[in-house]
Amino acid sequence: MEGFLSWEEYNFSAGPAVLPEEVLKEAADEMLDYKGTGMSVMEMSHRSKAYDEIIKEAEKDIRDLMNIPDNYKVLFLQGGASQQFAAVPMNLMKNKKAAYIITGQWAKKAYQEAQIYGEAVAVASSADKTFSYIPDCSDLDIPEDADYVYICENNTIYGTKFKELPNTKGKDLVADVSSCFLSEPVDVSKYGVIYGGVQKNIGPAGVVISIIREDLITEDVLEGTPTMLKWKTQADADSLYNTPPCYGIYICGKVFKWIKKMGGLEAMKAHNEKKAKILYDFLDQSKMFKGTVEPKDRSLMNVPFVTGNAELDAKFVKEAKAAGLENLKGHRTVGGMRASIYNAMPIEGVEKLVEFMKKFEAENA
């Protein structure tokens, strides 16, 4: 399919992950000389006119893609999503209380980090069934004085996704969208904060994008909050308070343009749904491989599956790699297999995976 990978190795890594071939080729062409500047973006001053154009254009393009309202700031930051686990309570815990919905390891880590700074209340959890579903969030017992409600919208390890946002009862919603960023349309106005590491669906590791409603960016932060973790510091400096991850942002900008070229977020959603259906349909009829997530909560991005036999799982991963299907081993905390099928994964990659799974099943029945 035009715009996607054309070689025979398919990378199903959960992140850092597959990038569009077109983007990689453009970056290679510009590696030694970016648009006649005589230098690589890697060498370029972040205060230069050329780089100023790169970061401003990247912001414009993500605003266009997500239809981000004018009263939201877009920040290109460092420290990954994990650093935002601390930045969120530091910037938002006015009453030193927040509600967390625990649907996997990353939501749990964010919840544990927030407990350092105030009272983090777990208002729902799917830990009772190994995070294999999304709990009902239509009528949560949210403390009246909670400053925000926090979710990890797509759970990379366990393969679940919020299909409907929780009823926050008027509280600001904060969402870690690291593994579903730009995979489908989103109504930004329903969130107070959206953030995510880019290394799954948007670019190379080293950049986190935070989209924050302006009224939440204030000087009123927890005492002792480091200057670099104050959103106001970064917002006032347009993400240039210190040297940003210049090259990573440059690649993100190219991915934004690629998504636009492919038809925007509606087209990405259709593409991702088609890929996921191919894989889930096979899992639902297979006698050997089983999905681990309740069907209504299945992620379009991360698909975990097992054979039920650890030795057979290991054999599958080894033979899949030899067949050009890379990085299918499940997360170290859960085992089994996981296929991450982000935006840049072509349909052909999923078709080849299913073809191999059928062959493996026949040979190992």
Feature roles, as predicted:
Residues 3-9, 322, 335-365:
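PLP-dependent enzyme catalytic core of the Aspartate aminotransferase-like
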Residues 39-84, 91, 105, 113:
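Conserved N-terminal alpha-helix of the aminotransferase class I/II PLP-enzyme fold
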Residues 174, 188-199, 208:
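Conserved active-site segment immediately N-terminal to the catalytic lysine
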Residues 8-59:
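A glycine-/small-polar-enriched, mobile loop at the entrance of the PLP active site in fold-type I
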Residues 20, 198-280, 294, 363-365:
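Active-site C-terminal subdomain of aminotransferase-like
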Residues 289-320:
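Conserved PLP-binding catalytic core of the aspartate aminotransferase-like
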Residues 15, 114, 125-181:
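Active-site phosphate-binding strand-loop segment of PLP-dependent enzymes
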Residues 82-149:
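PLP-dependent aminotransferase-like
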